């Protein structure tokens, strides 16, 4: 639970945690989503030990940012264009921007970094930042990191969300069962009322419609396979194959 974060940080001697939320990686960024409660926005969450978490966000995402309940800090507090003009180099400008952010917010000491990122550019950014801030010690956790440990236990609000998603998922599964049961057997093939074969593709079309109707996401597709494919891990199924 989030209330465990300060204890976990103290146990590991972590002064602050930084959770990156870059553009385009929202659905694959559980650490960032954990703090922003699934809000559709980009930014950076920073939490100092013993203090509330802060969200650095773009000013045009103010409404989404407000829904997170975090302490809000718009990024236009720092003038990136001015920094660009001073450094004359895009990479150095972003390093300097992050240095100013950390300095102004009092971020230093042992700092852990989390979130789904573009590995190469983020490694370059952290390397440059460490050179600019001698008092910064970058802490990397390989296994059982602070956030994953905090997420092992759930707040009542999280459990309620999980139940709602479970109920919606069951409704989608029931719609698929009803659709398949509406067909009839023609030999070893399942056909619809007109006698046309019902295919895996038809089932997946229904799945996508029902998921959308329930407000659920399907970013990587749903596995629905039969026969040999069903025995192969992560085989998604041949959409043209009729149901047997």
What are the language-model segments listed below?
Residues 37-50, 106-110, 132, 153-156, ...:
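Acidic/histidine-enriched ion/cofactor-binding microenvironments in catalytic or ligand-binding pockets
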């Amino acid at each position: 639970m989030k209330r465990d974060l300060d204890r976990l940080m103290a146990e590991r001697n972590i002064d602050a945690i930084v959770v990156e939320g870059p553009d385009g990686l929202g659905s694959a960024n559980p650490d960032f989503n954990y703090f922003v409660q699934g809000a559709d926005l980009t930014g950076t969450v920073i939490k100092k030990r013993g203090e509330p978490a802060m969200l650095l966000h773009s000013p045009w995402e103010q409404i989404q940012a407000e829904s997170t309940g975090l302490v809000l800090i718009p990024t236009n507090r720092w003038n990136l264009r001015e920094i660009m003009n001073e450094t004359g180099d895009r990479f150095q400008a972003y390093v300097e921007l992050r240095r100013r952010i950390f300095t102004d917010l009092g971020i230093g000491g042992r700092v852990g970094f989390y979130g789904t990122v573009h590995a190469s550019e983020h490694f370059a950014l952290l390397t440059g930042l460490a050179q600019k801030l001698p008092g910064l010690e970058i802490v990397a956790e390989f296994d059982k990191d602070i956030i994953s440990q905090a997420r092992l236990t759930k707040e009542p609000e999280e459990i309620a969300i999980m139940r709602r998603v479970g109920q919606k998922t069951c409704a989608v599964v029931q719609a698929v069962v009803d659709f398949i049961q509406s067909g009839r057997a023609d030999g070893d093939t399942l056909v619809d009322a007109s006698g046309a074969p019902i295919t895996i593709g038809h089932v997946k079309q229904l799945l996508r419609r029902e998921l959308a109707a329930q407000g659920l996401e399907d970013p990587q597709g749903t596995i629905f396979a039969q026969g040999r494919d069903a025995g192969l891990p992560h085989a998604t199924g041949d959409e043209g194959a009729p149901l047997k």
